[in-house]
Amino acid sequence: MEEPAPPRSRSQRTADTLERLRGDVDLWVASASADGEAYLVPLSYHWDGSTLTIATPTASPTARNLLRAGRVRAALGQTRDVVIVEGTVEAFPIGADLELEDAHASSTGFDPRTLRDEYVYLRITPQ
């Protein structure tokens, strides 16, 4: 068995995290209903350098749970090098920020504006 790598310095961990946020496309979003039922879903995201933006159907458990709680826990990366993001959630409807919506569509390859179902964008601000 290969010897595990030594721990990275704080500056190296920060650099690696920022690189993953810039380079990855998908993350796992965890939420819970008001009665504590856990819900986990993969979603594509856009990283603008300080916030993550995801889009999900307005009627989905994810949207309901995150909008009720106002907080999120998300994970991205490989199991042995996972990045956990905890943050606050702010919703904005389609059409509210066209520049960000275009950036989300460009970086994720997914544009909810073209779909029939009603979607909401959720901006995650890491804490």
Q: What do the predicted segments below correspond to?
A:
Residues 1-12, 79-127:
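Charged, gly/pro-rich active-site loop segments
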Residues 2-28:
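Short, basic/aromatic recognition patches
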Residues 13-16, 40-41, 59, 109:
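A generic local structural motif
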Residues 17, 25, 50, 81, ...:
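A generic secondary-structure signal marking the coil-to-beta-strand transition
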Residues 24-58, 64-66, 72-76, 84-85:
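Short beta-strand segments
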Residues 57-59, 126-127:
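Secondary-structure transition/turn motif
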